[in-house]
Amino acid sequence: MLTWLKRDDLSFPPLETALREPNGLLAAGGDLRPERLLAAYRHGCFPWYQEGQPLLWWSPDPRTVLFPDELHVSRSLRKRMRHGDYRVTFDKAFAEVIQGCAGPRSYADGTWITTPMQDAYVRLHEMGVAHSVEVWQQGQLVGGLYGLAMGELFFGESMFSRATDASKVGFVTLVERLREWGFALIDCQMPTRHLESFGARSIPRAAFAEALAMHLDRPSAADWRA
């Protein structure tokens, strides 16, 4: 039976109670205030819903993650990064990045990054928890991604690209920086060929929960202003 969250209670049901079909649906309802979002990520779940649906919370099993030391970069992409005209920054245009991620996609109808969702993550950015990666070409924002940094973990949310390989360049730059900062794991949530091409792989939900317990409260050397 699916748990419906109460507004005055920030707790989530145990991860092992998530539904098998659809895979990982843990709870419904609640809200997107910062306290609940932070509680969700600490617990091992994340919000995802389409416009017109109730707010849904997910913890899939298995969970797709990328260990920074396992990053794979193709020779063609590495060449583009060396000789291309892209410039990558952090936290310079968070609102614009999340708007880009919410834009229309050729392969999907609608967006799960609704206006309330955008507003919620902008608030987390203002709190110093959510961060963006921007990819620029001739002064124009052509790609980027955003997510949350908590302890030694980064929770990736979405990315977009308006130029060839722009989001890939941003993602690789982020992973290499996270590796320098000593991050242990990047949460990719669900498997895609795109992420798997970089070395992302699936681990049991229980192993993901163990990683949360081990790394969430460890201080990192991250400097997003650099």
Swiss-Prot record:
Swiss-Prot/TrEMBL catalytic activity: N-terminal L-lysyl-[protein] + L-leucyl-tRNA(Leu) = N-terminal L-leucyl-L-lysyl-[protein] + tRNA(Leu) + H(+); N-terminal L-arginyl-[protein] + L-leucyl-tRNA(Leu) = N-terminal L-leucyl-L-arginyl-[protein] + tRNA(Leu) + H(+); L-phenylalanyl-tRNA(Phe) + an N-terminal L-alpha-aminoacyl-[protein] = an N-terminal L-phenylalanyl-L-alpha-aminoacyl-[protein] + tRNA(Phe)
Keywords (A to Z) from UniProt: Acyltransferase, Cytoplasm, Transferase
Pfam families reported for this sequence: Leu_Phe_trans
Signal peptide range: none
Annotated GO biological process: protein catabolic process
Record-level GO cellular component terms: cytoplasm
Subcellular localization: Cytoplasm
Record HAMAP family: Leu_Phe_trans (MF_00688)
Family: Belongs to the L/F-transferase family.
Protein name as it appears in the record: Leucyl/phenylalanyl-tRNA--protein transferase
Gene this chain is encoded by: aat
